[in-house]
Amino acid sequence: VKHIVFAHRKLSFGGGERVLLEQVAALAALPVKVSVIFRKEPGKRDIEPELRQRNPNVAEVLHLPGTFGAFSWLRRTRPDLLVLCNHKGVQRALPWLARLGCRIPTAVTLHEHYERHLGKYRGIRNQVDRWLCTYDFTAAVRDRLGPAPCAIIHPLYPRPEARIVPAEERRIARRHLGLPETGTVVGYVGQIDGRKDPAGVVRFAEALEDTHLLFAGREEPDTAQALDLRLAASPLGERTLRLGPLPELGLAFAALDLYVMTSRNEGFFPLALIEALERGVPVLAPTVGGIGTVLKDGEGGFLLAKADDRRSVPEALLVAAAARLKPLLADEALWAIHRAKAHAFGTALTRDYDAAAKFREALSPWL
């Protein structure tokens, strides 16, 4: 039986962890043994139950944070394939293993085209057999990491057919959350950290003026503190609701008129955007990562034409977007058309794409 090892940064909820989960699930029907090792947050194994449920061949899920532990374990187990994503201990162990004649076939999942992301793998680029890119940044990989083959696998996974949230359900969701049943509600739902730059969401909402603001999702401590200070100085301070992490985010999405993302940088196309769109919630998002290659302005969402430079969305762009969207949000009939476009685009996005088959095809030489 072939042994496939997935080495990942962490197992708490996040976009990269969703990709890991779907990669593991893609091998469920094959006669292979699967191990998962990770390096950070040993007490946050959020996705472990679903990993085991989606693939009964998961034999072990191990916290192996350091180089020596990863080296010893890999040397002992000698897997048939290593699928790696941002596990520093494993990355440091691989050259030492190779020097001792233990050459492990390796595929690396790349979520972003940024130098900071690709540069992590420069030290092992000659030991990588395949790069797994979430969107087409092959040229950057060739330039910075060398000639190993690239497979383009978008993280678009089958989802239950969602329906557009009707007005009455939106009112019920707002009442349940303590928001006004009428009026404009904009916000962000998902992991809240420095990269997501929630201060940009606040600035956009301030420029809209007559609105309520909603945040839902786990807040990274430093970002939460910065958001506290930002809201304390904002006229929206008393009209902002922060729900923190929730077991089910459906109510938060349902309450929104507009989903606002102001990330400094992103990967292919964040799952949260899909979750908003498929419910009929139009999105406002920056042209970073793969977002601008997928979302067309006015067809379910609106784009902030931001340079892909890992910096905050410029204030002028946020203010201009608010000026553009304010009259659209105020026109219920017109906004209903944008809701319908969002729903149609969001549900079609994942319907006919088989990421699992593409993943198995990319790994087929070792399966």
Label each region the model flagged.
Residues E17-A25, T184, Y188-A207:
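A conserved mid-protein helix/loop that constitutes part of the nucleotide-sugar donor-binding site
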Residues N55-A59, A226-P245:
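Nucleotide-activated donor-binding/catalytic signature segment of Leloir-type glycosyltransferases, i.e.
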Residues L84-V90:
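Short His-centered aromatic/hydrophobic patch
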Residues P282-A285, L295:
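Short hydrophobic beta-strand element within catalytic cores of glycosyltransferases
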Residues A316, A330-S364:
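A charged, aromatic-enriched C-terminal amphipathic alpha-helix characteristic of glycosyltransferases
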